[in-house]
Amino acid sequence: MNVISAMMEIAANPQTAEGKPTTPITYDSNCLEEICGSCAMRINGKARMACSSLVDNLEQPIRVEPLSKFPLVRDLQVDRSVLFENLMRVKAWVPVDGTYDLGSGPRVFPQQQEANYPLSNCISCTCCMEVCPQFNEATGFVGAATIAQVKLFNNHPTGKVFAEERLRALSGDGGIQECGFAQNCVEACPKQLPLTEAISDMNRDVIVQKVKDFLRG
């Protein structure tokens, strides 16, 4: 049994420690198979996915807490809107003009597919942001997940149209310069994304972009 299944059973018959009926605990959950990223929480003090955390593999008693870096909604539910705001800030999408037939689109070669696929596995769970010492209100750091998505879309043959804008966004306030390279993110990521590699690559590209902008005047 995983943690989220145990919580669902508790929610079906919620009781206080004294055995009195009470309201069910509030938490986010959807896919139950580590795809949607919604059930991220602190389990025994560690940011992880409740759906892939097995009860038998955890130290007992199990302590569950909400993620601490995000506004608390209620119980274990938090507001992770900041991630999506950051993704909008760096234009983390592929622009598509639907007013005419786009055809089959550009060819993506196997080498590109192999390089990009790991980054496409991000489930927006925000575990990387939770464990990052630089992700806080003071720095406004966009976080590893956002930086990794910049690399993904800048490597996409259609997404490249916004490449310079994305790099400029990463060079601004709360951008890549706030990363202290603690590498907590890559340890916490449930999908084993190459986050530190993405950060290093984007740091290089940001510097190159700043030099280009300087020379252009």
Give the residues covered by each predicted segment:
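Charged interaction scaffolds used for protein-protein
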Residues: C51-S53
